[in-house]
Amino acid sequence: MAITNGNVGSGQTVDVLTVPAGKTYAITSVLITNTGSEDPTGGQDSRFYLYAVTGSYTANNSMIVNNAVLPGAETFTLDTEKLVLAENDKLKVSVSGTNSASVVVSYLEV
């Protein structure tokens, strides 16, 4: 099992994982954490999108999570099913709002 991680700033869309040529990966989990502090008023909330992209990037055709609210200091976990990506496929994360997000992806080569 391997992991990759990165930081996605507010207003950015980042490729958090790109499958190399000749490889296939099974994504076992994706963790997205709001780097802001806990704030019951919602002042540290951010929103995020998660995409699995093949070929050209088309948001409406590749969206896994759509504009989800991620409160300050909270973590979203996607781990109920494996997501299989072939060579050149990508996982992208887009963040908007007050804070950046830390993203960790766990995967297996298959």
Cite the ranges covered by each PLM segment.
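Intrinsically disordered, low-complexity Pro/Gly/Ser/Thr-rich segments with frequent PxxP/GP/PP motifs
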Residues: 56-88
